[in-house]
Amino acid sequence: SREHPLANKKRLSIEDLYGETLMMVKEGDSTVVDSIREEIRKHPQITIEDTPQFYDINVFNRCEQTQNIMITLDCWKDVHPALVTIPMDWDFPIPYGLLYALNPSQDVEEFIRIVKKENNTLFE
């Protein structure tokens, strides 16, 4: 919530979350979030509340109404007018991939070729 005591901070540390309830998808839904959960469990001063695998407006509303803190991505920063997104001081990168048809168009094939070349990454 924009009214939360931490809302004006530029970055948050794990210690900033002490005494807070942290909303996150339930264990097993995301390997990255599971890694974050393992780190959070080392800090019993933080309570974990499981949410559904996919956040919907009800989850965002609950976060705002309860003044809880929620694990989210930067892309959700404008999803709710009463919530604010603040980066954490931790290194848990989120992997992204490309999903395309088994028999892609020439344009898609060219795009994939460029991505492979630029990122020096192998796609299977």
Predicted regions located by residue number:
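Residue-level preference for short coil/turn positions at secondary-structure junctions
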Residues: 18-19, 64-66, 81, 92-94
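Short helix-loop capping/hinge motifs at secondary-structure junctions, enriched
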Residues: 3-13, 30, 90-92, 103-110
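Residues at the C-termini of beta-strands that transition into short coil/loop
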Residues: 1-2, 26, 52, 87-89, ...
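Secondary-structure junction motif
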Residues: 6, 14, 19-44, 108
